[in-house]
From Swiss-Prot:
Lineage, broadest ranks: Bacteria, Bacillati, Bacillota, Bacilli, Bacillales
Region (7 X 3 AA repeats of Y-[NS]-N) location: 83-115
Protein name: Staphylococcal secretory antigen ssaA2
Subcellular location: Secreted
Residue spans of the Sequence repeats: 83-85, 88-90, 91-93, 97-99, 103-105, 106-108, 115-117
Amino acid sequence: MKKIATATIATAGFATIAIASGNQAHASEQDNYGYNPNDPTSYSYTYTIDAQGNYHYTWKGNWHPSQLNQDNGYYSYYYYNGYNNYSYNNYNNGYSYNNYSRYNNYSNNNQSYNYNNYNSYNTNSYRTGGLGASYSTSSNNVQVTTTMAPSSNGRSISSGYTSGRNLYTSGQCTYYVFDRVGGKIGSTWGNASNWANAAARAGYTVNNTPKAGAIMQTTQGAYGHVAYVESVNNNGSVRVSEMNYGYGPGVVTSRTISASQAAGYNFIH
């Protein structure tokens, strides 16, 4: 499978990404040297953010997202352009999570989700709340060590109430997960690294047991990371969907995590 290494600066004015090919099964390493003209799969880009929060990219190299080649199935690469608009191209590549649509200024608060068609009806364009992490590892190769937050009972995602507007930074993992659970969690839990503790304090159950509909959380990286648990397989592996995991802000992807790896994550129920 392709091995993807990224080096990003999520909050600054530029970022460099390098793509390297390989068949190793271990986690990919970060390429600190950026674009290599001798590598046909290497590229880099810079971006600027204008006053309206729109991203403007300048590419260098021979590689382009349209060349992305995973192992099988169907994959949609979503290119995030600003905080309110998504443009996307579909590729016959690795995932069945194939349609992400976000409708702004929608007057109804009803939300509808399923694995093949994620629709978020949201009225806000706020850029407050927590960030997520941008990762440089390939799909199934993340080794995580986390400290379990104290377990609490009283509230749950499945029976909770909508807390209101999504105040997390648009395009980040926290923003996606808040919408994915229908807003039935706190909107001011901060960075993803803080979510397990914030959830426990708010009365949600937090443990190391995955369950469909739960939130997977880790403190790994500068800001931590959260993802939505789509399903738990018979062998204990966990299928999650997530935003900003290796492909930049606004990009929704999915992956399967082994049972042994899943045991190192926190799960908010």
